């Protein structure tokens, strides 16, 4: 597997986490996101999403195998996807959009974004596993 493809994916995942949180939370001032899911999307939770973004960037700088690191990343993304699906089943996106468009957009896309990067991390994991 081309290391450049892996690096681009890791950098993109980091950008989505860091820039996405800063943009949609309006630099941690959008309380509608916090109140829509106070456990997962508190300002602390949003900060931890950004920390995961930094971890993805750090992984892009590693020149050896990152097989088990991306496995952990895939599990992390899986957890967020499950939480997102549960949130969608128990809440109304339409109501959230009426409160704040950025919060509505955030909750509309974050799980899909995490699902896509989960698949990417799994792809890297299995490719590095088969390359041994």
Segments predicted by a language model, with ranges:
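Short aromatic-rich membrane-water interface segments that cap or initiate transmembrane helices
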Residues: 39-42, 101-109
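Mid-chain, well-packed structural core segment of small domains
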Residues: 64-93
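Cytosolic juxtamembrane helix and N-cap/initiation of the first transmembrane helix
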Residues: 1-16
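Core segments of alpha-helical transmembrane spans in multipass integral membrane proteins
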Residues: 15-19, 37-61, 75-82, 112
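Membrane-interface helix termini and inter-helical loops of multi-pass transporters
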Residues: 27-35, 93-100
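Alpha-helical transmembrane segments of multi-pass membrane proteins
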Residues: 17-28
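Membrane-water interface at the C-terminal end of transmembrane alpha helices
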Residues: 108-132
């Amino acid at each position: 597997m081309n290391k450049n493809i892996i690096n681009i994916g890791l950098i993109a995942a980091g950008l989505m986490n860091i820039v996405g949180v800063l943009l949609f939370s309006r630099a941690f001032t959008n309380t509608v996101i916090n109140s829509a899911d106070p456990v997962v999307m508190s300002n602390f939770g949003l900060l931890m999403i950004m920390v995961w973004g930094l971890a993805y960037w750090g992984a892009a700088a590693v020149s050896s195998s990152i097989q088990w690191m991306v496995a952990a990343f895939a599990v992390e993304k899986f957890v967020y996807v499950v939480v997102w699906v549960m949130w969608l089943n128990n809440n109304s996106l339409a109501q959230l959009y009426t409160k704040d468009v950025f919060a509505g957009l955030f909750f509309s896309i974050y799980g899909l974004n995490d699902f896509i990067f989960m698949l990417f991390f799994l792809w890297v994991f299995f490719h590095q596993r088969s390359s041994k």
